[in-house]
């Protein structure tokens, strides 16, 4: 994080300490449990090492809302990632390893509550959109006066699971050309072979990009980044 900020990155997307449910729960979810004090320590370590103060965006949108609300009240991050479509992820990018799977509905009443709480606390929402239904939900919150423009969204391409959007230039162009007024977008690509091509398209179109160990731990196919 520190080297990225000192090299010019403006937003740090943080994953503080957390654990994932070992199995699908009775309510159909498989989500994350957060170590709230650990998040504060990670943020402070970043502040201490940076020459300029970055925007801190708390991730792990697959955390449960009551605990994430507690996290926001306790620490007031600049931004928080909020999944605006159902979580249905299948991290099976390494052959031979058991995939990590996540499930959560994130219905509109929950999204409305996210918008109310973040508005009261002065925390900016990042609306995660794994497919275009997430944009529709964000528009819905904007029309109801619960989200304030500009709405900041992230398009996720190549993230496997039931909310998958293919990592192609055509998909990137579709997202760009259907962007509603009052929206700004960021792009994340989880595909080692296609990442740099799609991010280049996003930049040319005037969008923003997200890179790092979560999105793609490879510098090129089969070559892991060292940190």
Describe the residue ranges of each PLM region:
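Short, acidic/polar
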Residues: 1-3, 64-72, 195-199
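Non-catalytic positions within long, well-ordered alpha-helices that form the structural scaffold/packing
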Residues: 5-6, 73, 119, 203
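A structural motif
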Residues: 6-9, 77, 206-207
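Glycine-rich, proline-tolerant flexible connector loops at the mouths of alpha/beta enzymes
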Residues: 10-39, 156-159, 216-221
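Alpha-helix-loop-beta-strand connector modules within alpha/beta enzyme cores
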Residues: 23-58, 113-118, 173-182
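A generic, well-ordered mixed alpha/beta core segment in the N-terminal half of proteins
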Residues: 39-86
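Catalytic alpha/beta core domains of metabolic enzymes, predominantly
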Residues: 79-214
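C-terminal functional modules
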Residues: 225-227
């Amino acid at each position: 994080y520190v080297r990225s900020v000192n090299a010019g990155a403006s937003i740090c997307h943080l994953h503080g300490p957390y654990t994932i449910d070992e199995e699908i729960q009775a309510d159909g979810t498989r989500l994350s449990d957060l170590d709230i004090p650990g998040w504060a320590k990670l943020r402070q370590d970043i502040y201490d090492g940076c020459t300029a103060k970055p925007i801190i965006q708390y991730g792990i949108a697959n955390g449960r809302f009551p605990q994430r609300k507690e996290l926001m009240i306790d620490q007031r991050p600049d931004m928080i990632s909020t999944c605006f479509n159902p979580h249905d992820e299948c991290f099976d990018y390494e052959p031979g390893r058991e995939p990590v799977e996540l499930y959560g509905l994130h219905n509109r009443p929950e999204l409305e509550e996210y918008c109310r709480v973040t508005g009261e606390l002065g925390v900016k929402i990042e609306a995660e959109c794994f497919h275009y239904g997430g944009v529709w939900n964000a528009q819905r919150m904007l029309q109801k006066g619960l989200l304030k423009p500009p709405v900041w969204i992230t398009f996720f391409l190549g993230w496997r699971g039931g909310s998958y959007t293919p990592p192609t230039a055509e998909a990137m162009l579709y997202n760009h050309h259907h962007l509603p007024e009052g929206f700004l977008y960021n792009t994340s690509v989880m595909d080692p072979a296609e990442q740099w091509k799609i991010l280049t398209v996003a930049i040319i179109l005037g969008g923003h990009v997200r890179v790092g160990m979560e999105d793609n731990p490879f510098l090129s196919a089969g070559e892991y980044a060292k940190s």
